[in-house]
Amino acid sequence: MTLFTTLLVLIFERLFKLGEHWQLDHRLEAFFRRVKHFSLGRTLGMTIIAMGVTFLLLRALQGVLFNVPTLLVWLLIGLLCIGAGKVRLHYHAYLTAASRNDSHARATMAGELTMIHGVPAGCDEREYLRELQNALLWINFRFYLAPLFWLIVGGTWGPVTLMGYAFLRAWQYWLARYQTPHHRLQSGIDAVLHVLDWVPVRLAGVVYALIGHGEKALPAWFASLGDFHTSQYQVLTRLAQFSLAREPHVDKVETPKAAVSMAKKTSFVVVVVIALLTIYGALV
């Protein structure tokens, strides 16, 4: 079920998910606007409710019509939670603006892509493009690699854990876009995701190390296994940058393309691993 769902979701996401319509983040915005108080307890409570509703839905559909409705729910939740249709539009808009030397449009789209972690003030063009690469790699992790990890971890209840992670991701993006840094801090969302991302970041990091320059990346990856304080964003992007060391860092079009190309390779490796685990009976 996991492999079948993953393949179909990735195919549908690539063909049809070109905007916000099939994005959980967009569907939850109306609900998030009603939240007036921010705390860690509220963040966890909302997430548990989302997971609980998903669990009850799957439980109610068990055994109905040869589990066809269950399969459809797996696909629907996977399509809502995996992939970043709107972000992909922002990325292509950035490339168009950069190729036309439209500095205003380019800066606007880069701002959308780097919304969560931002770009250091006063950085030069090379540093700016490296941070843009990092943002694209992180988007690939947040919208593809990490959701797939939680879908797998959940086993037969994969959509439940996937929904929980995607809900937290949507909550963080909404807070970053519409609320103050203080409200985001009060919500505790960054701390929760720091914990949840620890394992999937290390798994993604070892893939980056193996497909890139392992002689530099692998020692850094082993060092990260004992690091519980550095942000997961920094851990992942530092490992990825070892693999991107020989790629261009001065071309405003080719630099982000190099990051996206490597992110696609990593996603492909993950799908292959899922297929092998399914073949050998480790996944359902």
UniProtKB/Swiss-Prot annotation:
Entry keyword Membrane: yes
Write out the transmembrane intervals.
44-60, 68-84, 195-211, 268-284
Its annotated compartments are: Cell inner membrane
UniProt main location, coarse: membrane
Q: Membrane side Cytoplasmic: which residues? A: 61-67, 212-267
The UniProt induction remark is: The level of AmpE affects the basal level of beta-lactamase expression in the absence of AmpD and in the presence of the AmpR transcriptional regulator.
> Which GO terms of type biological process are on file?
response to antibiotic
The membrane topology term of the UniProt record is: Multi-pass membrane protein
What GO CC annotations are associated with the protein?
A: plasma membrane
User: What keywords tag this UniProt record?
Assistant: Cell inner membrane, Cell membrane, Membrane, Transmembrane, Transmembrane helix
Q: Pfam families, from UniProt? A: AmpE (PF17113)
> Could you name the domain of life of the organism this protein comes from?
Bacteria
The residues exposed to the Periplasmic compartment are: 1-43, 85-194
What this protein is reported to do is described as:
Putative signaling protein in beta-lactamase regulation. AmpE seems not to act as a direct sensor for beta-lactams.
NCBIfam families on file: PRK10987.1
**Could you identify this protein by its name?**
Protein AmpE
Name the source organism: Escherichia coli (strain K12)
The gene from which this protein is expressed is ampE
